[in-house]
């Protein structure tokens, strides 16, 4: 079984963990509808990506759904 040869110092441990931090999300504003969206992803509210409609969004009439 593998056993460490010597103790890992606090400095070496910290240097190894320097790249482990989580990065907060960086949302961008959709140029079509103005909602926040993830960069390089289709806008979930309007379905546009790169100023083109990629996913057709169905128009919902609230008056018909209530009846």
UniProtKB/Swiss-Prot annotation:
Molecular function per GO: structural constituent of ribosome
Single GO biological process annotation from the record: translation
UniProt keywords, alphabetically: Ribonucleoprotein, Ribosomal protein
Zinc-finger keyword on record: no
Pfam families reported in the protein's UniProt record: Ribosomal_L32p
Origin: domain of life: Bacteria
Gene3D superfamilies linked: Single helix bin
GO cellular component: large ribosomal subunit
Disulfide bond annotation, renumbered to this chain: none
HAMAP family: Ribosomal_bL32 (MF_00340)
Family that this chain belongs to: Belongs to the bacterial ribosomal protein bL32 family.
PANTHER family named in the record: 50S RIBOSOMAL PROTEIN L32, LARGE RIBOSOMAL SUBUNIT PROTEIN BL32
Protein name as catalogued: Large ribosomal subunit protein bL32
Annotated source species: Jannaschia sp. (strain CCS1)
Classification lineage: Bacteria, Pseudomonadati, Pseudomonadota, Alphaproteobacteria, Rhodobacterales
């Amino acid at each position: 079984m593998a056993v460490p040869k010597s103790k890992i110092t606090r400095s070496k441990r910290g240097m190894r963990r320097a790249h482990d931090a989580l990065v907060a999300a960086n949302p961008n504003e959709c140029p079509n509808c103005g909602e926040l969206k993830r960069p390089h992803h289709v806008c979930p509210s309007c379905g546009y990506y790169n100023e083109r409609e990629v996913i057709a969004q169905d128009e919902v009439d609230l008056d018909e759904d209530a009846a």
